Amino acid sequence: MKKAPAGSFPAKPTIAPERPILVFDSGIGGLTVLREARVVMPDRRFVYIADDAGFPYGNWEEEALKRRIIELFGEFIANYDPEIAVIACNTASTLVLEDLRRAYPSVPFVGMVPAIKPAAERTSSGLVSVLATPGTVKRAYTRDLIQSFASRCHVRLVGADGLAAIAEAHIRGESFDEALVMAQIAPCFIEKDGKRTDIVVLACTHYPFLVNVLRRLAPWPVDWLDPAEAIARRMKSLLPARSDDDEFHSQDDLAFFTSRKPDYAIRRLMQGFGLRF
């Protein structure tokens, strides 16, 4: 297979460790999924991979991005032999999930898709907004979800072209202009026939890191729906059960960045999540 564009990877250990769960995102938003996965699977080993060399994915031409992710996973699978792989990125999941399953049939893949079905089940007003990247908004897959599960609701798709980058800045402790955040989320709030939007689906794993900011800036209270917990439960359901006699993993959880150059703030963040480089 052609060498992945992100550079060389660590050599595969000579003594095979416990097969990890691989959590992949374009940046650090997938940590929201990792956090929930550890709650439901504290005995499992994780490898977190951020394709920061390719971030943000919204700037990519679709076929080029698809090729990149498929090639990267060839390296990831060869080096880490994951028990399961989680695409903790809505943009990547809606673009390439099925291609990954075809390319690597021996690895179970779990993807992130907008939580439109639970939003439709939970809404009282029937007014639901989906806050996502422009790539997720324009995919036919997203519209198919609406047609299948939310046809009786008024669903507004809101493509936020800069919110993931703002979330990354926020996680790093950097300042940002809250007016930009307000401009990104304002289209989510609809008033119609005396009713208001009551659920906003967070259809990007970066956005939950901003949820306290979003709550404060919102013109009225809504349910900010984060699918990370449901994805973690789905991951667990695909793995073989462990008995009480099974030993917990002894290997460290790892973080790998495709740029090979995470800055100091990111390294501190990863260490705070108990991830070793």
From Swiss-Prot:
Keywords: Cell shape, Cell wall biogenesis/degradation, Isomerase, Peptidoglycan synthesis
KW Isomerase (keyword) present: yes
Residue positions of the active site: C89 (proton donor/acceptor), C204 (proton donor/acceptor)
Pfam families: Asp_Glu_race
InterPro entries hit by this protein: Asp/Glu/hydantoin_racemase, Asp/Glu_race, Asp/Glu_racemase_AS_1, Asp/Glu_racemase_AS_2, Glu_race
Classification via SUPFAM superfamilies: Aspartate/glutamate racemase
Biological processes annotated in GO: cell wall organization; peptidoglycan biosynthetic process; regulation of cell shape
Catalysed transformations (reactions): L-glutamate = D-glutamate
Gene3D superfamilies per record: 3.40.50.1860
Class of enzymatic activity (EC top level): isomerase
EC number assigned by the record: 5.1.1.3
Listed pathway(s): Cell wall biogenesis; peptidoglycan biosynthesis
Family the entry assigns: Belongs to the aspartate/glutamate racemases family.
Function: Provides the (R)-glutamate required for cell wall biosynthesis.
Protein name listed in UniProt: Glutamate racemase
